[in-house]
Amino acid sequence: MKQGVMTNPLNREQKMVMDGPEMFWVLTFSTGLLAFSAPGALDLMAIRLMVLEVFCLVGLFICKRSPQWSPAIIFYLIYIIWLVIGLSYTPAPGYGFRVILKYLYPLLIMLFASTAVRDKEVFLKAGIGARIVALISIGVFFIPYVGRLFPGVFWYGTASAINYISMCVFSLALFYYTQEKKKNLLLCILFMLPCILWVFRTSIMGTTLALMTFFFFKYKLKSLPVIFSVFILFIVAVFAIPSVREKMFYDDSGKGIEQLNSGQISMDDIDSNGRFAMWEWSLNKFFYGEELTGTGTGNLQEVFYSLQHPFAPIRICHNDYVQILCDNGLIGLVLFGGSFLFLILHCFIVFQNRRYDTAIHLCAIVAGASAAGTLLTMYTDNVVNYTMATLSYPCGFYGMMLGLIARYKRV
């Protein structure tokens, strides 16, 4: 099997030998934030997704190590099977196939990571590589005129901000478990800033929940004061930062913490940019009456992409859970939600097991916390549309955790 030499992330003066699947895993995980969709040119994102999925499948077959299965992965596989069944009764099979491709990628990422990764050096190389690419993207987005030199290379801001949730948690974990305290703390803070500067409420909420989950993993019930403090900081940010407050409410004048405490602020005051109306319309038309099975995989996406709805020119419903309900019903939502519930619970159990080494604990807390944050963002955005940059990262960390556990058990 082909081998390559890379710098050891634990000692930059040393070199490490990796086999072909390990090198391809590092490359795949490090470059998920690259979109290659230059404006005015051929959109390569869907093609790249298909190619990556084929390569992951090939990697599973050529790697001498076995993929690791868990209740989370099995549940997710059943969910994919249910999506395929949904093609049999959908009026939009073409869009259904595209939806399946997007949901299939996290599954393949979990399986391929659990197969390729057996050493902590490979895990750190992949994670640090992904963080370097994310740092470069921040420079491209925020340094004046630099973005013009790289049009369409990175995913746009919405997807990137959700990707930064995983990188923020990864940096925080390295702060706790490595000697480079100052560097990793600064990077953790840096990855929090874009969603605030861009005023992306979805990513702000996702980052907040990811941090709360991280501290709960680490300190359990002792973390409640810290979790409460993080939540208070989120509330303060909503009301104290003018740009966030202006985007949050239809009329931000007179909106403050005092009004929140007195009950003067209701859901009617929140500016959802039409999301609430879209969700209600979608559920009324495609979910109610077909609660168990929905109306078929890809149906809602086809309706929005073809503008067969009263909310033109909007082309997505901005809620993955509403789309699951409309396309695949309660069965689909239970299977998808159950898989990630098992994932987070498994990560929590692994993190509390003191027999495992630091690398496994680090992987577990990053996977569990970033999964919680990313799942929350799916409530107000179609995160699966950018699955290479978003949902695949918690799943990738989870897959690497399974691979490291397999090495630990073998030893």
Regions found by a protein language model. Name each.
Residues 43-60, 100-109, 160-170, 204-212, ...:
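Membrane-embedded alpha-helical segments of multi-pass membrane proteins
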Residues 266-284, 288-328:
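Long extracytoplasmic/lumenal interhelical loops at the membrane interface
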Residues 197, 218-265, 280-288, 297:
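A membrane-periplasm/extracellular boundary helix in multi-pass inner-membrane enzymes
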Residues 72-82, 93-116, 134, 138, ...:
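Aromatic-anchored transmembrane helix interface
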Residues 132, 328-372:
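Hydrophobic transmembrane alpha-helices and their immediate junctions
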Residues 53, 108, 121-149, 154-219, ...:
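Alpha-helical transmembrane segments of multi-pass inner-membrane proteins
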Residues 1-85, 91, 95, 115-128, ...:
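Transmembrane signal-anchor hairpin modules in multi-pass inner-membrane enzymes, especially those
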Residues 52-55, 342, 364-411:
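Transmembrane alpha-helices of multi-pass inner-membrane enzymes
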